[in-house]
Each structure stands twice: as C-alpha cells, then as structure tokens.
C-alpha cells in the first residue's frame, strides 16, 4: 500500500486529482471500451484506441488519469482481480503529432506506474495497426520494460488477424477486427467510473489529495 501511494505522489500530475470529474475532456474522445464478453481465460477484454488521442482536446496526463481510473474500477470485481485484463491497443490514425506527446520521460512514467502501482494483472497486450515508427520506439524502450510485461506484448501485422483470432474468438470481437460483434455492442466504461466518484474520493483520503 505504501508503494502504491508513493507512486501516486511521485506522479502527482496524473494522480493529484484522481477523480472521474477531472477527465471529462478525455472521456469525450471515447478511446477505451470493453467487450461485453470475457476472453477464454476469463479476463476482461479492453479496446484502447490510442489513435483517438487528441492533444488539442486533453492533455497526456488527463488521458492517463482516465485509463488508470478505469483500471482501478475494474479491480473492484473479484473475477477481474483473479483473471486480469487482455488489452487490444489500436494505433490506427496515431500521427506524428500524437507521438510527440509520448516523450521518453512520459513513457518511463507509464512503465513505472504499471510496475509499482497497478495491481491489475495484464494477461496480454495485442498491438494493432502500428505505424513503422512504433517499432523503433518500442526497440528504444525495451530496456525500460518490465520483463514480464515485455513477454505479454504481441504486435500484429496490419491486416493479419489469424493470431489475434486464435487468442480472442471472432464471435466476441467487433466487426472492424473481422469479428461478428456490432460496434454498438461494446461496453461504455465511462458510465462505470462516473458512478463511482465517491469511491475515488475515499481513495484520496488515504493518499495524495489536492490539499496535501
């Protein structure tokens, strides 16, 4: 617990106002949703469309705050505590302007938060529609990645779905990934975190607060 709150204090630009109400601009991007069905290993499947990030709409820190609010909320489910999450990270439309927001120090912060603060187990991370520059950045970041996390990342060549479908059945994937699920069937996670504002106020009582 001490490590959890120490990490939050260190990255206060993300966690100082760790409340859903501070992420409304990021929520307007609608960049993260969940499948209505769990994967074969009972993990929740999240779709993170990083290409929807717009630095003219919200800051990098607000986007990360929203993501970690969602992860914290998912952890309140006992099944998810045990089985974790499977992440689909879609980099379609992720431009050079957006890449420029991911500075080495920010990337390092993300890795550190995952390693020292996030208790939600990541089962696998499927990277889709990655631009060429992503491979270069990934190779530069390899030595900073936690070995356990590194083993879980899978890069899928654009337009090739066989490996993704071998791990996540097409019947629970949306049509854009050559599945059969209508996009309208995806789960809105923002309603979930917005209804838990009191829960996050309680969390802040024990760690970093905007008045500390």
Label each PLM-derived region with a short phrase.
Residues 1-212:
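Basic, amphipathic alpha-helical/coil surface patches used to engage anionic, phosphate-bearing ligands
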């Amino acid at each position: 617990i001490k490590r959890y709150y120490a990490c939050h204090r260190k990255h206060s630009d993300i966690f100082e106002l760790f409340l859903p109400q501070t992420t409304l601009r990021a929520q307007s991007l609608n960049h993260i949703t969940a499948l209505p069905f769990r994967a074969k290993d009972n993990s929740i499947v999240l779709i993170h469309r990083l290409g929807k990030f717009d630095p003219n709409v919200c800051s990098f820190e607000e986007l990360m705050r929203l993501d970690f609010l969602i992860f914290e909320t998912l952890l309140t489910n006992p099944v998810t505590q045990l089985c974790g999450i499977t992440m689909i990270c879609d980099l379609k439309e992720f431009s050079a302007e957006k890449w420029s927001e991911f500075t080495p120090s920010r990337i390092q912060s993300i890795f550190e938060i995952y390693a020292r603060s996030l208790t939600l187990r990541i089962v696998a991370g499927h990277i889709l529609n990655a631009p060429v520059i992503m491979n270069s950045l990934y190779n530069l970041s390899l030595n900073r990645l936690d070995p356990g996390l590194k083993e879980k990342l899978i890069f899928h060549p654009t337009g090739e779905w066989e490996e993704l479908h071998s791990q996540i059945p097409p019947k629970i994937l949306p049509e854009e990934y050559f599945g059969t699920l209508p996009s309208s069937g995806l789960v809105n996670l923002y309603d979930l975190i917005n209804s838990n504002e009191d829960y996050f106020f309680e969390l802040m009582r024990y760690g970093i607060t905007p008045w500390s």
